[in-house]
């Protein structure tokens, strides 16, 4: 399974999954249709599936046009998003699976950013070392999504599930927010040397107009404050120990950053 990162809108990423064996494709969170259609034209591939993580317009905006072009495709999304995702045909819950390119993806229910958010995890095959997590707006490189419909406690539980995946998991998040996320992170985790190194690397990458997605989960565990609610440095700066309260305090600080 080849993964193509397609920039869209001002800072979105759409991910096109390509099965070279039968020249079919699936797409994760098509904000708009045009980049997907252009990529499919270049590949000569047929789109057979849309995997939506949540209902926000910048994740489902391309669904309708893609369905018009490929009327046989199947649209997957959360059971909790019924009626909110255009063209949705499959309603997924925690523990469900999806199939593509000979791989089985596991569905995680990860409410917080929205009440129905899900993530798709494709573990490595026997001859692979790295798995792939499509997490929408739950985890960002260096950050996490705002809590529009959920609570800090929900988000801690959701991110906690994803945090337990193998360190060598690629995090395919849906936005290029990394530089701003790390600019905030260094203010709350000041003595984190891994974070300082990553911040400087991202500054250089963005100056060169390089993408910073995907990242690796192991790197996020070391440097992303929203995966580090149980670390003394974050507990100290918030003056709290309870995971949801630590997380909520840091999220509030980021919202006002």
UniProtKB/Swiss-Prot annotation:
Query: In the record, what terms sit under GO molecular function?
Result: hydroxyacylglutathione hydrolase activity; metal ion binding
Q: Any idea which positions bind Zn(2+) 1?
A: 54, 56, 113, 137
Task: Give EC number(s), comma-separated.
Answer: 3.1.2.6
- Example of a GO biological process term: methylglyoxal catabolic process to D-lactate via S-lactoyl-glutathione
Query: Which keywords label this protein?
Result: Hydrolase, Metal-binding, Zinc
Please give the InterPro entries that the UniProt record associates with this protein: Clx_II_MBL, Glyoxalase_II_hydrolase, HAGH_C, Hydroxyacylglutathione_Hdrlase, Metallo-B-lactamas, RibonucZ/Hydroxyglut_hydro
Q: Is-annotated flag, keyword Zinc?
A: yes
> Do you know which Gene3D superfamilies this protein is assigned to?
Ribonuclease Z/Hydroxyacylglutathione hydrolase-like
**ATP-binding listed as a keyword:** no
**Residues the record lists as binding Zn(2+) 2:** 58-59, 137, 175
Identify the domain of life: Bacteria
Comment on bound cofactor: Binds 2 Zn(2+) ions per subunit.
Q: Which Pfam families match?
A: HAGH_C, Lactamase_B
- SMART domains the UniProt entry points to: Lactamase_B (SM00849)
> What is the reaction catalyzed?
an S-(2-hydroxyacyl)glutathione + H2O = a 2-hydroxy carboxylate + glutathione + H(+)
Q: Which cofactor does it need?
A: Zn(2+)
Q: In which pathway does it act?
A: Secondary metabolite metabolism; methylglyoxal degradation; (R)-lactate from methylglyoxal: step 2/2
Protein's job: Thiolesterase that catalyzes the hydrolysis of S-D-lactoyl-glutathione to form glutathione and D-lactic acid.
Q: How does it assemble?
A: Monomer.
Q: Which family does it belong to?
A: Belongs to the metallo-beta-lactamase superfamily. Glyoxalase II family.
Protein known as: Hydroxyacylglutathione hydrolase
Species classification? Bacteria, Bacillati, Cyanobacteriota, Cyanophyceae, Oscillatoriophycideae
